Amino acid sequence: MKITIEYSAQIRRTLGVSEETIDLMDSQSLHDLILHLAEKHGQLFKDLILDAEGNLSRMILASVNSVQVQESTSVDLKDGDCVNLMSPISGG
């Protein structure tokens, strides 16, 4: 199944891309996708999006098809889904 991932803010700057499409096996969760992306993009990306337990960091906002996700392990992905990963913008 094909999943489109959109990156915003610091994640986009870290990767140097704003979007990519990934082919996954059927029956994958958002958490599975995040682990796949962490392995694909290396340690800097992994440190940015994962916490010490290997879960999505609380500092990263995730949405699937424009609906914000609170727990990445509870969301099953479907062919054609669009996932957005972003770090909140802060400062003053």
Please provide the spans of the model-predicted regions.
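Ubiquitin-like/PB1-type beta-grasp interaction modules and other compact soluble beta-rich domains
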Residues: 1-91
